[in-house]
A protein has these predicted regions:
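Conserved catalytic motifs of ABC-family nucleotide-binding domains
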Residues: 34
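Catalytic Walker B motif of ABC-type/P-loop ATPase nucleotide-binding domains
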Residues: 38-41
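H-loop/switch region of ABC-family ATPase nucleotide-binding domains
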Residues: 74-75
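A short, surface-exposed alpha-helical micro-motif characterized by mixed small hydrophobic
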Residues: 80-82
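Conserved ABC ATPase "signature" region
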Residues: 1-9
């Protein structure tokens, strides 16, 4: 619990925790088994931006402090860029790219180009 900075929640019932903190508790439970690898499945989906940032910082801390290999399943380009060194990009159940995150921009697969272009969509205020 201390490794994931949750000691102040030790007397709180799980039903009283937010979705984000429930995810942090799930990470703490997984770490109790001292794994060599951890799977994060859409770790920041459906949480507010502050909790998302807390979870991302936690993932980066564990990566650094424990040298823990992580597999992150996500559709969130920002999350991928912040936490991943390498990426496997799947399309129709097949890997169409495997390599450094920084080189993903150079990939010419149309589905990857489309995915990356979605990150550049400008939001119109009030719409």
């Amino acid at each position: 619990m201390s490794m994931v900075d949750l000691l102040h929640f030790r007397d709180v019932y799980p039903t009283d925790l937010s979705t984000g903190y429930k995810r942090a508790v799930a990470i703490a439970r997984a770490l109790a088994a001292q794994p060599e690898c951890i799977l994060y499945d859409e770790p920041t989906t459906m949480v507010d931006p502050i909790m998302s940032d807390i979870l991302i910082h936690l993932m980066l801390k564990l990566k650094h402090d424990l040298r823990l290999t992580a597999v992150v399943v996500t559709h969130d380009l920002d999350l991928m860029r912040r936490v991943a060194d390498r990426v496997v990009f799947l399309y129709e159940g097949r890997a169409i790219y495997f390599g450094p995150v920084k080189d993903l921009e150079k990939c010419d697969h149309p589905h990857i180009r489309e995915f990356l272009a979605m990150d550049r969509v400008e939001m119109v205020p009030g719409v």
